[in-house]
């Protein structure tokens, strides 16, 4: 195989891998616009890698214009392919007859419509678990069942019925389910057992993860240094205030450290000492430069120094402020489980959730990551992070009525009794 053939093989292998990471081939799960975006981003990453390979082999910078023209053609091709493939898929595979079973209340039907999944799932029944148990034969004609907030006993009955009849089941998990997903199956005393224990990653994984942190942070600092210099000048020129913003956050085992970010708010944004989450575009504390750098996550770049220092990792649960973590612990005691792993610059919840995703859902996402430590998963999250950089909904503020720590009586941070209870929760794993 000649060098050209090897390069072509590497290009298409990368395209398939990155396209799968970005869900660029999931016709049944993504809107056409999302498919086009994912495919275009996969082409952009592969084209960039190809450009670097050609540069290294030829030892001079190649003309970028042909590459840009080819990329425009790739976007057009991706759009045509996404439309035709989507049209073919849903003509070939009609929507699954679906039942939504809920415990108290479920928004699953609304979410299916909101995310454009009604082409994939045709919801025929939306019933409570109690009613379903009494008339479980109603599920006989279903192809798919969603379970949301269903008690374990009722859920087991429904699961057994569905699995025996080849019905696909999607379960919205609780915290216990997520913890159990990382259990180690074994046998002892002639009995099948599931071993569940505190998160303890293998030493070789931790060593390789730390090596990856150092390599990626150094490389990113070199590549991003021009952007960081321009950002620092812009922040200083806008209001003359400090360029960097330091804030105490919590990492593994609730150890406090100072996180470093580019300042995106006014210098006196929290002069009263009370922690407040951003409300997004409506937050008048954010400066003009701040809106730009927050939109593209440029304000996060100085955290690369935290990664080099060892307080942060490239991938892990996002670090919270102690006072906000105390509020989470007060209302979500399971939050302390999230502090078993080192905090990260990006994470599972950041990639697959939104800024205003509920704390409970984010907690479950972080625990899913912690339950299955893997360098391959880390690499997938790093690649997927690139995808969300240009999606505005990933940086939305806290919506009205959202169940965040700020909404859960943020004023209680000044209440000594509540604050002590939250601190006890945090210290419980130290």
Label every model-predicted segment:
Residues 1-3:
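Short, small-residue-biased leader/transition segments that mark boundaries at the very start
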Residues 182-219, 243-247, 354-375:
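Glycine-rich flexible loop motifs, especially short His-Gly-Gly/GGXG/HXGH segments used as catalytic or interaction
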